[in-house]
Amino acid sequence: SPQGLREAADRLRRSGVFKSVSLGVDDCITAQDQLGITATLVENKRRHFSFGAEVASTEGVGITGEWMHRNLFGGGENLKIDGAISNIGVAQGGVDYLLGAMLERPATFDADTTLTFGIAGGIIDDVDYDMNFILISTGLRRVFSSTLSGSASVSCLYAQTTDPGGETTFQALALPLTLIWDTRDSTTNATKNGYV
């Protein structure tokens, strides 16, 4: 059905593997009374790198970088590794370092569910405290319909801080849940409906 074709094309686009997706119905019926579908796909570059730098009078120089590998194992998996160095050259405090990685696996359990794994760590050198931390997370993202999507995840944080009061160790467990209802007529230039 046309609706089924649209849903299949949307799933392929959401994977991030393809920059262009077109699904069309064939003109002729086969001997088994079946109508074929032709898929025209243009694959994104498998590897992507980005780099950024910013300068602020109060926060010094910041440098960010990101590397992404699309379709890592051939099933639409995306691996993203990003890092940041900030507060370079500030008068107070020190340099902060952040490094993280995220693996996304689409079509887990069913065609509309994406499984995610993430790990991040950092060193924060603030005026009032120093902190070393590591954060590990895993979760599921689900598209329920063309207007409704949601996610559920679990994350574990371990951090050590040092301040004038001494050294403190933190351990935290978080269970973030999100639900998005998007009825906008356009994601880039909406003129009606809403986003909650």
Q: What is each stretch, according to the model?
A:
Residues 2-196:
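Gram-negative/organellar outer-membrane beta-barrel architecture
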